């Protein structure tokens, strides 16, 4: 009885504890699943796609629950939702064709992305900013958004910081900037790269 009450507290189910499962929302059903999984206080918890199909509020609640559980348990998550990895994980492993092809913290994997340290720029009007950047050796290239020609990603060579250099050029050339920010990198980009390399090697 004491353990049941503790689990209800931990997964925040007291408000619906007298309802049958079929009357619960998807988010609460997911919490019931978590409650069942931790009832016997396992040291290791393995969760498969824990927020799949949930709305943003439900995702937030389940992710907070997972973080709380991870304080005294090893929690392993299998997911294809890469935002989940940055939201709750301290270590990320990418598996392709049954082999580990990447292993590190989310930040370490993001640093392997071609978009690590890239500067994203949105302009108020069309402008050829690539020609203004041709003299910067740390700029590895410029990508223009295929759907909006006012949006650019300025890529950094070898992950070097280029924000201050690009900012100076933008001010000197009077770019019509409305947004300007640096990317940490994209896990999706790293996932595609390492899994395609594995598939191409076979």
Show the residue positions of the predicted features.
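ABC transporter nucleotide-binding domain
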Residues: 63-157
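A short linear hydrophobic-aromatic micro-motif
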Residues: 60, 138-143, 176-181
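ABC transporter nucleotide-binding domains
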Residues: 1-96, 101-102
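Residue-level signature of the cytosolic catalytic core of signaling kinases
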Residues: 13, 24, 102, 125, ...
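Positions that flank functional sites
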Residues: 23, 148-149, 185
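A general structural signal for well-ordered alpha-helical segments in protein cores
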Residues: 31, 62-63, 130, 163, ...
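C-terminal coupling/interaction segments
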Residues: 157-202
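Conserved protein kinase catalytic domain
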Residues: 8, 35, 110, 191-192
């Amino acid at each position: 009885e004491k353990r049941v009450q503790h689990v209800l507290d931990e997964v925040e189910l007291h408000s619906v504890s007298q309802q049958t499962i079929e009357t619960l929302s998807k988010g609460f059903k997911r919490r019931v699943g978590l409650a069942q999984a931790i009832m016997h206080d396992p040291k290791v918890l393995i969760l498969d796609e824990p927020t799949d199909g949930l709305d943003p509020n439900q995702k937030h609640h389940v992710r907070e629950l997972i973080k709380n559980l991870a304080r005294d348990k090893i929690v392993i998550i299998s997911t294809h939702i890469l935002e989940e990895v940055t939201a709750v994980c301290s270590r990320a492993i990418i598996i392709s064709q049954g082999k580990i092809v990447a292993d590190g913290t989310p930040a370490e994997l993001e640093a392997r992305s071609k978009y690590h340290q890239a500067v994203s720029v949105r302009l108020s009007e069309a402008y050829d900013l690539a020609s203004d950047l041709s003299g910067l050796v740390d700029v590895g290239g410029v990508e223009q958004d295929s759907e909006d020609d006012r949006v650019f990603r300025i890529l950094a060579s070898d992950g070097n910081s280029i924000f201050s250099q690009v900012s100076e050029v933008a001010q000197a050339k009077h770019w019509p900037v409305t947004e300007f920010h640096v990317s940490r990198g994209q896990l999706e980009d790293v996932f595609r790269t390492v899994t395609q390399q594995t598939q191409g090697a076979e």
